[in-house]
């Protein structure tokens, strides 16, 4: 079981978010660092993983409200499709 904490206070933009996820989850070098690429990676994820979301207000502030909302929706959508992922906030 893998555990990942996404702390909105530690991520200061979209690049930080995608760099963090790529490193923490061991994404391949061809990872596109955008929401479509993240969706593709997470829907095919095969390792039992729990992702904890903390400081969501800071995440929204740092990513921008619209991008943060899309990111959170993506995580919840992927959680429904992939039994290996659990999203907790």
Where are these regions (language model features)?
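Positively charged, polar, low-complexity stretches
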Residues: 1-89
């Amino acid at each position: 079981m893998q555990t990942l904490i996404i702390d909105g206070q530690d991520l200061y933009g979209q690049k930080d978010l995608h760099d963090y996820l790529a490193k923490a989850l061991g994404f391949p070098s061809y990872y596109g660092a955008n929401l479509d690429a993240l969706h593709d990676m997470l829907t095919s994820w095969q390792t039992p993983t729990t992702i904890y979301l903390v400081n969501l207000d800071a995440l929204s502030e740092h990513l921008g409200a619209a991008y943060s909302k899309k990111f959170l929706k993506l995580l919840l959508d992927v959680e429904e499709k992939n039994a290996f992922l659990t999203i907790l906030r």
